[in-house]
């Protein structure tokens, strides 16, 4: 638990209605963990009274209205205070860093249900200081940064009698992005009502404009539409939202603090999205028994009497608010040396981090940590903490740390020298004492090393500190993958409405909202042309907009089963059992199952793609077996069925499960051409049959389908050809000569889960 410094703030006073007095802080700050604040170098004056005013060095004065105490609010929802959260120190520290520097790069919190992810995000908003905005700004424009104002604000800004721009103090915005948000609501669109009234195109700001200089919260970002998430991060990376659509050309700043949360059990987040967020932390770290009891106790007390909990952490909350204000001023003067940058780069290299974002974000985090501590230079502790918060979750690490029994602990830092005896003289003036303390702090900072004695990662990329292993493993488990499989199917007739688009033919589903927005600016002109005034709204064909719909893409599992030979009946029974198990669990995932046995001279579709269990039972009641082994035709038939299903628009992922021993004796030509058997052409050799099958396997990979080969060949006569098929198709291979339906189902579900996460 950290404490704020007891040093007095110079040139800082608290003024009541009659008197002013200097103040000190000695309050526990559980939110800040082990950080300390030294506000004595502060270069601006903070005066707190009935209404607080902050006098900045440039002479601007912002009037801050006092916030209402929670106990005085008689309506509305009260959110759990951040200071009352038990544990989760790393996440709370990261949130405070984001409060100090909104452009730090964002914070992602991963965790299962009930780990206080949303609670902490909303708790941070309660301690954010208010902001000063230009009156009439739709994007919370900062009066001190006219270069970042939205288009047209300079012309419509209001000025007071003293010639200064009128400003107002508002609460820091907190905007949550719903999962079903459309592109229009996110980035902004045409204001239909105002456009109809004025006869010109009027821009209506979206959620991104509302969130500028505040908090932008995305719950379950892993479930957010892929196009929306890409658009969101692109705008946040650029820091400006540029809208070019429907006759609109508008731009406004967008620099909020991004806080994203998600549950990995409901789906992984794409790796490139996590890479663009600075701090990625897990809320699933284990809690001690006492901490869990304390968490239940404080939550129960909050439900019974929230005012009591607010009063209990009132001092800590006030200290955190002051900490944020002071650290924002310190951050302007914090510097980081070249040697310290080299240390961060080396840690990123040893951790196997891709790109340069890891060290860039880590340097910014280290400076924020130094600002919290009241330092003008980044120290050793700040570097270590930055590596833990930024680089460690991005690393590719060795699962087992090296043996540390023979490792010696790092030497302690040298003790401060040349202690000045003037500290014991209590009769000296306060200004001289502060000057001497500043001088002594500068000497200590010069004596302390600039970089840590040890790296967190060793030269091979393994963790040196085994205490961080669990934390790193949690970060690795939640990473997503990039692949070619489609998770969403777009169409114009079925699914969820995500955005309007210009029609490419007849309009199947009219986007009424977008159509009215496109027609709104021309209503006055069209009404003037209509002499009879027969309509209230004039819409022409060029205004028409179609809906772009999206729906969840299901998967198709095609079982290609070798129904030839003495073990054919067992293989067919196991494939039938595995198919029924998958269908029983595919209701929510929209997965389909198909069974194609191959025997005799050709393969046949015994069960076409279906989600119906009753249909599968009826179709699989009779299981044909015996005869030759046309493996090539079985795989070719599976590809044809998969491509037809993909064209239907219901399937986004296709996986072929081949249950075979890899021994084929029927060529593809014989299977497709009945007259080939009657001809005098020589039978193909065993090598020619293998080459033909490998060629089909290569085509499976080129079509984007996934192949899982379950080898049932006896190991004593095994040729290993089934494994070669999987290698050429770049699929998965399992050797299961006596596989049951449960084993086949488990292997299929494992491969299917990996395909869905890709």
UniProtKB/Swiss-Prot annotation:
Domain VWFA: start-end pairs: 556-752
Protein's organism: Nicotiana tabacum
Reactions mediated catalytically: protoporphyrin IX + Mg(2+) + ATP + H2O = Mg-protoporphyrin IX + ADP + phosphate + 3 H(+)
Name used for this protein in its record: Magnesium-chelatase subunit ChlD, chloroplastic
Segment annotated as transit peptide: 1-62
InterPro entries assigned to the protein according to its UniProt record, in alphabetical order: AAA+_ATPase, BchD/ChlD_VWA, ChlI/MoxR_AAA_lid, Mg_chelatase_ATPase-dsu, Mg_chelatse_chII-like_cat_dom, P-loop_NTPase, VWF_A, vWFA_dom_sf
NCBIfam families: BchD-ChlD (TIGR02031)
GO cellular component: chloroplast
EC numbers: 6.6.1.1
Quaternary organization: The magnesium chelatase complex is a heterotrimer consisting of subunits CHLI, CHLD and CHLH.
A Pfam family of this chain: AAA_lid_2
Molecular function GO labels: ATP binding; ATP hydrolysis activity; magnesium chelatase activity
Family statement drawn from the similarity comment of this UniProt entry: Belongs to the Mg-chelatase subunits D/I family.
Recorded metabolic or biological pathway in which this protein acts: Porphyrin-containing compound metabolism; chlorophyll biosynthesis
Biased composition regions of type Pro residues, renumbered to the chain: 408-417
Database matches in SUPFAM superfamilies: P-loop containing nucleoside triphosphate hydrolases (SSF52540), vWA-like (SSF53300)
Keywords carried by this UniProt record: ATP-binding, Chlorophyll biosynthesis, Chloroplast, Ligase, Nucleotide-binding, Photosynthesis, Plastid, Transit peptide
Region (Disordered): 395-453, 669-688
Function as written in the Swiss-Prot or TrEMBL entry: Involved in chlorophyll biosynthesis. Catalyzes the insertion of magnesium ion into protoporphyrin IX to yield Mg-protoporphyrin IX. The magnesium-chelatase is a complex of three subunits, CHLI, CHLD and CHLH. The reaction takes place in two steps, with an ATP-dependent activation followed by an ATP-dependent chelation step.
Top-level taxonomic group: Eukaryota
GO BP, sorted A to Z: chlorophyll biosynthetic process; photosynthesis
Cellular compartments annotated: Plastid, Chloroplast
Gene name of the record: CHLD
Biased composition (Acidic residues): 421-438
């Amino acid at each position: 638990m950290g404490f704020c410094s007891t040093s007095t703030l110079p040139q800082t006073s608290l003024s009541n209605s009659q008197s002013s007095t200097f103040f000190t802080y000695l309050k526990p700050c559980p939110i800040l963990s082990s950080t300390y604040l030294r506000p004595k170098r502060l270069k601006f004056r903070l005066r707190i009274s009935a209404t607080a005013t902050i006098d900045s060095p440039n002479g601007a004065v912002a009037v801050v209205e006092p916030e209402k105490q929670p106990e005085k609010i008689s309506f509305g929802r009260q959110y759990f205070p951040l200071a009352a959260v038990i544990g989760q120190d790393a996440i709370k520290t990261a949130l405070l860093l984001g409060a100090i520097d909104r452009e730090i790069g964002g914070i992602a919190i991963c965790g299962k249900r009930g780990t206080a992810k949303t609670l902490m995000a909303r708790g941070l908003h309660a301690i954010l200081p208010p902001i000063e905005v230009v009156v009439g700004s739709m994007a919370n424009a900062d009066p001190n940064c006219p270069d970042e104002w939205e288009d047209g604000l300079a012309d419509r800004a209001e000025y007071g009698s003293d010639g200064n721009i009128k400003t107002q103090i508002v609460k820091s915005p907190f905007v949550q992005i719903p999962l079903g948000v459309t592109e229009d609501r996110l980035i902004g669109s045409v204001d239909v009502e105002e456009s109809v009234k004025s006869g010109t195109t009027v821009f209506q700001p979206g959620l991104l404009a509302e969130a500028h200089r505040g908090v932008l919260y995305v719950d379950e970002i892993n479930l957010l539409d892929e196009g929306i998430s890409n658009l969101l991060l692109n705008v946040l990376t650029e820091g400006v939202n540029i809208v070019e659509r429907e006759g609109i050309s508008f731009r406004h700043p967008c620099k909020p603090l991004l806080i994203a949360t998600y549950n990995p059990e409901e789906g992984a987040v794409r790796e490139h999205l996590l890479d663009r967020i600075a701090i990625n932390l897990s809320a699933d770290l284990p809690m001690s028994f006492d901490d869990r009891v304390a968490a239940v106790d404080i939550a129960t007390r909050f439900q019974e009497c929230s005012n009591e909990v607010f009063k209990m952490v009132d001092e800590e909350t006030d200290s955190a608010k002051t900490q944020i204000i002071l650290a924002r001023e310190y951050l302007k003067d914090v510097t980081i040396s070249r040697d310290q940058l080299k240390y961060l780069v080396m840690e990123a290299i040893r951790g196997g981090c891709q790109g340069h974002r890891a060290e860039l974000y880590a340097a910014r985090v280290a400076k924020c940590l130094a600002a919290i501590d009241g330092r003008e230079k980044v120290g050793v502790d700040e570097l270590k903490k930055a590596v833990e918060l930024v680089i460690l979750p991005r690393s590719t690490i060795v699962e087992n740390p090296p043996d540390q029994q023979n490792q010696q602990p790092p030497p302690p830092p040298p003790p401060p020298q040349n202690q000045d005896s003037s500290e014991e003289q209590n009769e000296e003036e306060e200004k001289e004492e502060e000057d001497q303390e500043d001088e002594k702090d500068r000497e200590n900072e010069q004596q302390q090393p600039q970089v840590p004695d040890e790296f967190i990662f060793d030269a091979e990329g393994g963790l040196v500190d085994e205490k961080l292993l669990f934390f790193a493993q949690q970060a690795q488990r939640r990473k997503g993958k990039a692949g070619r499989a489609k998770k969403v199917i777009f169409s114009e007739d079925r699914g969820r409405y995500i955005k309007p688009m210009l029609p490419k033919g007849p309009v199947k589903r009219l986007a009424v909202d977008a159509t009215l927005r496109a027609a709104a600016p021309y209503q006055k002109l069209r009404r003037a042309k209509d002499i009879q005034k027969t309509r209230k709204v004039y819409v022409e064909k060029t205004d028409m907009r179609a809906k772009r719909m999206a729906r969840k893409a299901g998967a198709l599992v095609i079982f290609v089963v070798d129904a030839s030979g003495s073990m054919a009946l067992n293989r067919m029974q196991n494939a039938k059992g595995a198919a029924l198990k998958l269908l029983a669990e595919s209701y929510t995932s929209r997965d389909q199952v198909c069974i194609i046995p191959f025997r005799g001279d050709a393969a046949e579709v015994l069960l076409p793609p279906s989600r119906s269990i009753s249909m599968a039972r009826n179709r699989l009641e009779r299981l044909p077996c015996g005869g030759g082994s046309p493996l090539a035709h079985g795989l070719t038939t599976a590809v044809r069925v998969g491509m037809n299903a993909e064209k239907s628009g219901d399937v986004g992922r296709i996986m072929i499960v081949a249950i075979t021993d890899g021994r084929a004796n029927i060529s593809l030509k014989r299977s497709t051409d009945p007259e080939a058997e009657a001809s005098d052409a020589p039978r193909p050799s065993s090598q020619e049959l293998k080459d033909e099958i490998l060629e089909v396997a290569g085509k499976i990979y080129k079509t984007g389908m996934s192949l899982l080969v379950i080898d049932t060949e006896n190991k004593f006569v095994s040729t290993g050809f089934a494994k070669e098929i999987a290698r050429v198709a770049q699929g998965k291979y399992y050797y299961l000569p006596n596989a049951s339906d449960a084993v086949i189902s488990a292997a299929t579900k494992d491969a299917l889960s990996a395909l869905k996460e890709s």
